[in-house]
């Protein structure tokens, strides 16, 4: 996608750390802001809004995020109207939101992974108030559809099929910051893919913390990953289908047959 610049519009700058899931969620944050009259910019220096979409899987990602947040202190001092927001996995960790508030008192909005779809409401709340907005829900909610998306990787597109993870691997923090596994309806995923193909996208990557267990939380035996990729593969158009990430314990014979066909 080529984004044309309009000098009359306010500008937003989004900094993303971590996985493909975060990259796609940053596209959703951009979509929300674009729907409110903002346009993306490639530098924080002329931005009216700066959003950090953070990662906590690796300590290095947290250190880089904190370093870059701290570097905005002078910019915020020079521009009191600048709005700085921090979201993503880092903010979802227990006690991290208050720690960020203490370390960086110039942050305006802190929101958790379960509050991304609420970002528009939080942003409007900040525009109408001088108070800091901190919303980090501990419990994941149902899957919400219809969040606007400004895609930036044409002709490639990310499509979420699950959120969260039920595998509590010893080394991994994901279930604690992303919540329990929730699957999108198969019809919603297929319709999104159908529209992307119609729009000319040539590569679609299905996203989830564990795509192989797609549908396990839905009471319908036909809703599973093997059937999903089979149905998407039947769509008209010239495109490549990919997926990530997957856990070997849920890799079964129907899935092998679906991939091989």
Regions found by a protein language model. Name each.
Residues 2-214, 254:
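Proteins enriched for Cys/Gly/acidic motifs involved in redox and nucleic-acid/cofactor modification
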Residues 81-86, 95, 198-261:
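Conserved SAM/AdoMet-binding glycine-rich loop
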